[in-house]
Amino acid sequence: MTLTVLTIVIIVGAYLAGSVSSAVLVCKIRGLPDPRTQGSGNPGATNVLRIGGASSAALVLFCDMLKGAAPAYLAFRLGVDPIALGVIAIAACLGHIFPIFFGFKGGKGVATAFGAMAPIGHDLALCLLASWIVLVLVTRYSSFAAICTALLAPVYTWWLDDRFTIPVAMLSTLIVIRHKDNIKRLLKGEESKVSRKKT
């Protein structure tokens, strides 16, 4: 099997893996409400935190990150070129955002994108994670933190390993576009802040 064919197989596999909605499955297994019909309506870790608590949200976060990290790391180890690596990462995110197994109604793709970027290096992963955490703690807006971190990601990548600046910029653009409704709500002061289920 040539590297080109293998890359295409990984792209398809990345989309299918991304299409497995961790939030919906975790909530179903744990007897929680469907995140697509509760809270913000977004099947992601932040909404699961609101309706199901920290442990469920952490499990969703881990699974969503793994969906991006696994195909990206595999492609990285096989020597796939940076642009194709970016396409693979985007395929995983598109699977999360438009999941074929869940009526093409998915999440924002933030955790999956982070997972896809992580194989580039620990330094980048730490910079992204630190930026998101600081912004959430300061503003209490998960969406604002995600948007700002996505915008910072290509800058961090250029600084740490410029070979991957373009694919990371591709991912960041997708994340920002996916948050267009959040941006509108932020500008109107109508965006929900991060909260957790009270026990």
Curated annotation (Swiss-Prot):
<keyword id="KW-0997">Cell inner membrane</keyword>
<keyword id="KW-0812">Transmembrane</keyword>
<keyword id="KW-0444">Lipid biosynthesis</keyword>
<dbReference type="GO" id="GO:0043772">
    <property type="term" value="F:acyl-phosphate glycerol-3-phosphate acyltransferase activity"/>
</dbReference>
<keyword id="KW-1133">Transmembrane helix</keyword>
<keyword id="KW-0594">Phospholipid biosynthesis</keyword>
<protein>
    <recommendedName>
        <fullName>Glycerol-3-phosphate acyltransferase</fullName>
        <ecNumber>2.3.1.275</ecNumber>
    </recommendedName>
</protein>
<dbReference type="Pfam" id="PF02660">
    <property type="entry name" value="G3P_acyltransf"/>
</dbReference>
<keyword id="KW-0472">Membrane</keyword>
<feature type="transmembrane region" description="Helical">
    <location>
        <begin position="118"/>
        <end position="138"/>
    </location>
</feature>
<feature type="transmembrane region" description="Helical">
    <location>
        <begin position="56"/>
        <end position="76"/>
    </location>
</feature>
<comment type="pathway">
    <text>Lipid metabolism; phospholipid metabolism.</text>
</comment>
<feature type="transmembrane region" description="Helical">
    <location>
        <begin position="5"/>
        <end position="25"/>
    </location>
</feature>
<comment type="similarity">
    <text>Belongs to the PlsY family.</text>
</comment>
<dbReference type="GO" id="GO:0008654">
    <property type="term" value="P:phospholipid biosynthetic process"/>
</dbReference>
<dbReference type="InterPro" id="IPR003811">
    <property type="entry name" value="G3P_acylTferase_PlsY"/>
</dbReference>
<comment type="subunit">
    <text>Probably interacts with PlsX.</text>
</comment>
<keyword id="KW-0808">Transferase</keyword>
<keyword id="KW-1208">Phospholipid metabolism</keyword>
<keyword id="KW-0443">Lipid metabolism</keyword>
<feature type="transmembrane region" description="Helical">
    <location>
        <begin position="141"/>
        <end position="161"/>
    </location>
</feature>
<comment type="function">
    <text>Catalyzes the transfer of an acyl group from acyl-phosphate (acyl-PO(4)) to glycerol-3-phosphate (G3P) to form lysophosphatidic acid (LPA). This enzyme utilizes acyl-phosphate as fatty acyl donor, but not acyl-CoA or acyl-ACP.</text>
</comment>
<feature type="transmembrane region" description="Helical">
    <location>
        <begin position="83"/>
        <end position="103"/>
    </location>
</feature>
<keyword id="KW-1003">Cell membrane</keyword>
<dbReference type="GO" id="GO:0005886">
    <property type="term" value="C:plasma membrane"/>
</dbReference>
